[in-house]
């Protein structure tokens, strides 16, 4: 099944259109692509490079809690959302440190600046962890995924828990074609640190199996997509566990599927590696609800990947 992902990387390298992008990095992209993963045949955590499952778990649990503040993530040594919160802070009047303009590019090109950035970033993370008032102001990312999944605000000021509603519908009306959760809220997009890349997902029940399809408007193929595949596969497993279903397929539909210019060599290296068997996901059988799970309740067994391939993140 990993071949589905590798085929996407190969296709972009061979056929991708060069495009400028919001980050100024430049990408090779395709529009409209779909991959399918049979979750009964193994948990789709890529093996052609190590994918940090602990980060995937803590991010998904963060979403499930409806949380949008990076403090929860930092407490679990998860730094994948740091840059977007840090960017908001260094653009504020409260920031008095060295100039951090365009830090995402400068840190790759200027070793002296990279040291400055590392120091300021560490100060920022320490402040988030140790100062609740600072964390409330600068750890917040706006109404991103968790808020939309669990607390979608309506025009009358009430809130919709989309995810809880969908889980209940899977139990009571599994043939419904409305088993949908959307993270794309046009009213909130301007105030989000990063508008949702994975925008909407839908569940489908057939012959006692739960399948999930994700529509992802923007797909960072080398860094982001391996996380997204594993995250939504895990979400499908968790909901199947609560609803008493087996797992079916994870269907991943991509809008703008892109490979950043500075990820080309890394993708080529990954494509040169031999695929290994997917691991097995193990969930704590004593936990009944999706919302009761914690880090120690979710494990993978038999994960034997090739080494990590590092690549810069585009902010």
UniProtKB/Swiss-Prot annotation:
InterPro entries: Thymidate_synth/dCMP_Mease (IPR045097), Thymidate_synth/dCMP_Mease_dom (IPR023451), Thymidate_synth/dCMP_Mease_sf (IPR036926), Thymidylate_synthase (IPR000398), Thymidylate_synthase_AS (IPR020940). GO terms for molecular function: thymidylate synthase activity. It catalyses: dUMP + (6R)-5,10-methylene-5,6,7,8-tetrahydrofolate = 7,8-dihydrofolate + dTMP. PANTHER family: THYMIDYLATE SYNTHASE, THYMIDYLATE SYNTHASE 1. DUMP binds at residues 22, 177-178, 217-220, 228, 258-260. It is an enzyme of class 2 (transferase). Belongs to the thymidylate synthase family. Bacterial-type ThyA subfamily. The keyword Methyltransferase applies. Pfam families: Thymidylat_synt. Catalyzes the reductive methylation of 2'-deoxyuridine-5'-monophosphate (dUMP) to 2'-deoxythymidine-5'-monophosphate (dTMP) while utilizing 5,10-methylenetetrahydrofolate (mTHF) as the methyl donor and reductant in the reaction, yielding dihydrofolate (DHF) as a by-product. This enzymatic reaction provides an intracellular de novo source of dTMP, an essential precursor for DNA biosynthesis. Homodimer. The lineage of its organism: Bacteria, Bacillati, Bacillota, Bacilli, Lactobacillales. The active site is at residue 197. GO terms for cellular component: cytosol. This is Thymidylate synthase. Pathway: Pyrimidine metabolism; dTTP biosynthesis. Its EC number is 2.1.1.45. Gene3D superfamilies: Thymidylate synthase/dCMP hydroxymethylase domain. One of its GO terms (biological process) is methylation.
């Amino acid at each position: 099944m990993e071949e589905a992902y590798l085929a996407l990387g190969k296709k972009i390298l061979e056929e991708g259109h060069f495009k400028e992008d919001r980050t100024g990095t430049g990408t090779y992209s395709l529009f409209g692509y779909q991959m399918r993963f049979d979750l009964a045949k193994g948990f789709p955590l890529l093996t052609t490079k190590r994918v940090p499952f602990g980060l995937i778990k803590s991010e998904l649990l963060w979403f499930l809690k409806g949380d949008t503040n990076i403090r929860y993530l930092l407490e679990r040594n998860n730094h994948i959302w740091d840059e977007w919160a840090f960017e908001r802070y260094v653009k504020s009047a409260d920031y008095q440190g060295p100039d951090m303009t365009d830090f995402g590019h400068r840190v790759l090109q200027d070793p002296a600046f990279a040291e400055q950035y590392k120091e300021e970033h560490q100060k920022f993370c320490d402040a988030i962890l140790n100062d609740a008032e600072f964390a409330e102001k600068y750890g917040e990312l706006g109404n991103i995924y968790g808020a939309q999944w669990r607390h979608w605000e309506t025009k009358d000021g009430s809130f919709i828990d989309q995810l809880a509603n969908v889980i209940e519908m899977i139990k009571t009306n599994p043939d419904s074609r409305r088993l949908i959760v959307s993270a794309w809220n046009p009213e909130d997009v301007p105030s989000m640190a990063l508008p949702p890349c994975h925008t909407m997902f839908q569940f489908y029940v057939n012959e006692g199996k739960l399948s999930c399809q994700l529509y992802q408007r923007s797909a960072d193929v080398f860094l982001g997509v391996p996380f997204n595949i594993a995250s939504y596969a895990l979400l499908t497993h968790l909901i199947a566990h609560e609803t008493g279903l087996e797992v079916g397929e994870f269907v991943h539909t991509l809008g703008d599927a892109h490979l950043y210019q500075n990820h080309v060599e890394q993708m080529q290296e990954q494509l040169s590696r031999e695929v290994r068997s997917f691991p097995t996901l193990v969930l704590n059988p004593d936990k009944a609800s999706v919302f009761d799970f914690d880090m120690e309740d979710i494990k993978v067994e038999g994960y034997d990947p090739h080494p990590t391939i590092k690549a810069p993140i585009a902010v």
